[in-house]
Amino acid sequence: MSALTNLKETAFLRAFAFAKIPLLAWVRPTVVDFTAARCEIRIPLSRRTRNHLWSMYFGVLCAGADLAGGYVAMRQIQQSGHKVVFVFKDFHAEFLKRAEGDVHFSCEQGLAMAALVQRAIDAPGTRVEEAVAVVATVPSRLGDTPVARFDLTISLKLKG
């Protein structure tokens, strides 16, 4: 994905977060990569996001997982042109290491989200669900070694 596209996606994400979910705007997310198949969001380790141990606060890690998994679903819904209601049904987290740097949150299930949106459109009034996995890494310190893993169930329903 081009740097310009990522910049546009970041601007869109931050504007949406500022208008609808200000807490997410507060952590200053950046879109690192966004395609039909995957989404990678970076949240910087800063005074806003760190805890007393100088690692990323677990609430911010959860917000990053929300962003990576949710942004994929939100963009797929927008591209469909239909009014689909989107909520998280459940959320499971496994914290593996301290996140002592900027954290990258990756979701590789964009195509599954596109299929889920289509299932919601094809079954009006019925709630459809799909589990998505998000992996958090700190490339500057640990490379591809995960610092946390998240499983979120996304639930969609065609509005109307």
Regions found by a protein language model. Name each.
Residues 30, 92-94, 106-108, 135, ...:
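Residues located in well-ordered beta-strands
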Residues 44, 48-70, 82-83:
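Hot-dog-fold acyl-thioester-processing enzymes
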